[in-house]
Amino acid sequence: MAPLRDRVSTLPRLQLLVLLLLPLLLVPQPIAGHGGKYSREKNEPEMAAKRESGEEFRMEKLNQLWEKAKRLHLSPVRLAELHSDLKIQERDELNWKKLKVEGLDGDGEKEAKLVHNLNVILARYGLDGRKDTQTVHSNALNEDTQDELGDPRLEKLWHKAKTSGKFSSEELDKLWREFLHYKEKIHEYNVLLDTLSRAEEGYENLLSPSDMTHIKSDTLASKHSELKDRLRSINQGLDRLRKVSHQGYGPATEFEEPRVIDLWDLAQSANFTEKELESFREELKHFEAKIEKHNHYQKQLEISHQKLKHVESIGDPEHISRNKEKYVLLEEKTKELGYKVKKHLQDLSSRVSRARHNEL
C-alpha cells in the first residue's frame, strides 16, 4: 500500500480539526480524565482573563498540570523548568486566541502545533501517565549519573570519557550537559513519532477508503519532515559525543552549550547572508551567556534545597525561616531566567527554521 501522504489529497476543515486534536484527546487517563475541568470554556478563557489569587497561570488546565507536577515530587530544578515551559505554552495559546478571533488560523495549523507542544511537555515531565516517560532530573553531575542515561551506548561513552583523564572537572560537567541534551533530543523524537503515529491512525479510523483520495495531509507531511530533521540532528549529536569522548575538547570550540552548538550548526547550513550569519553568531554568544547564568542559578537552587532540608531536619525556626526565604527567591529567579532562555531559544529556532525554509 502506498504511503499515506501519497494516497490523500484534500481534507474537510471539520475532519482536519478533529484529526489535529486527536493526539491530545488520546493522552492517557490521568491527564484527560478530569471531566468538566478540561472543558473548552475553562481551557480557553476570555482575552482579558487574569490569574486568580494564588494561581500560577491564567489557564485552568495549566494550573491543574502544575498542581499535578507538585504532587509527583519533582526536583526543584525540574519544577522550575516545567514552570518555564508552561509559561511559554500559556503565552503561545493566548497569542493564538487573538489570531483565532481575527480569523488567522482557519486551517487549524497553529492550533495543531500548540496541541503537539503540550503533548511534548506532558511526556517530558512524566505528566502523561506513562511509565516510560522518565527523563534525567538534574543538570548536575554526580556519582550515579551514568545510570540515568538509559542507553548502553551513552553509558559506555560516558564511562570512557570519565576515566580517560582527558577532561577537567569543568569539562566533564560540560560534557554531561551534552549527554543530557542528546538524551532529551531522543526523547522528544520519540514523542513526535508517537504523536504522528496516532494521528495517522486517526485518518484510518475517521475516514472511509473512498474519502482517502480527497484528503491532503500537509500537516502529516510537515511532521514527517520534522522527524527527518530531528533524526539527522540525533545522528550528528551521537557522532559529536563519540568524537569528544575519545579526543577531548579542542582549543578552538566556537560554543560550549549543546543547544547553542545545534543552532549554530543549523544556521551555517541555512540561507543566511554573510552579514546575517555574523549577526546570528553574536546573538548566539549572548544567548549562551544567558544559558550559563541560568545553569548557575539552577545549581544554586539545588544547593539551597539541600540546605533547607538539612535545616528543617534540625528544627531551628530562625534558620528555617532564613533559608526558606533564600530558597524562594532563588526559585523565582530560576523560573524567570528559565522562561527567558526558552523564549530566546524559541525565537532563535524560528529564525533558523524560516531561513532554511526559504532556502528550500
From Swiss-Prot:
Name of this chain's protein: Alpha-2-macroglobulin receptor-associated protein
InterPro entries: A2-macroglobuin_RAP, Alpha_2_MRAP_C, MG_RAP_rcpt_1, RAP_D2, RAP_D3, RAP_sf
Assembly with partners or alone: Interacts with the LRP1/alpha-2-macroglobulin receptor heavy and light chains; the interaction is transient and coincides with a reduction of ligand binding by the receptor. Interacts with LRP2/glycoprotein 330. Interacts with LRP1B; binding is followed by internalization and degradation. Interacts with LDLR. Interacts with SORL1. Interacts with LRP1; this interaction is followed by rapid internalization.
Function as written in the Swiss-Prot or TrEMBL entry: Molecular chaperone for LDL receptor-related proteins that may regulate their ligand binding activity along the secretory pathway.
GO molecular function terms attached to this record: heparin binding; lipase binding; low-density lipoprotein particle receptor binding; receptor antagonist activity; receptor ligand activity; very-low-density lipoprotein particle receptor binding
Organism: Rattus norvegicus
PROSITE patterns listed in its UniProt record: ER_TARGET
PTM comment, free text: N-glycosylated.
Motif residue range(s): Prevents secretion from ER: 357-360
Family indicated by similarity: Belongs to the alpha-2-MRAP family.
Keyword entries, A-Z: Coiled coil, Endoplasmic reticulum, Endosome, Glycoprotein, Golgi apparatus, Heparin-binding, Phosphoprotein, Signal
Subcellular location: Rough endoplasmic reticulum lumen; Endoplasmic reticulum-Golgi intermediate compartment lumen; Golgi apparatus, cis-Golgi network; Golgi apparatus lumen
Disulfide bonds: none
Gene: Lrpap1
CC terms in the record's Gene Ontology section: cell surface; cis-Golgi network; endomembrane system; endoplasmic reticulum-Golgi intermediate compartment; endosome; endosome lumen; Golgi apparatus; Golgi lumen
Gene Ontology BP annotations: amyloid-beta clearance by transcytosis; negative regulation of amyloid-beta clearance; negative regulation of receptor internalization; negative regulation of very-low-density lipoprotein particle clearance; regulation of receptor-mediated endocytosis; signal transduction
Entry keyword annotation includes Signal: yes
Coiled-coil regions listed in the entry: 222-302
Pfam assignment, any one: Alpha-2-MRAP_N
List of residues that carry Phosphoserine: 53, 138
Domain of life: Eukaryota
Glycan-modified residues: 271
Location of the region described as LDL receptor binding in the Swiss-Prot/TrEMBL record: 240-356
Signal peptide stretch: 1-33
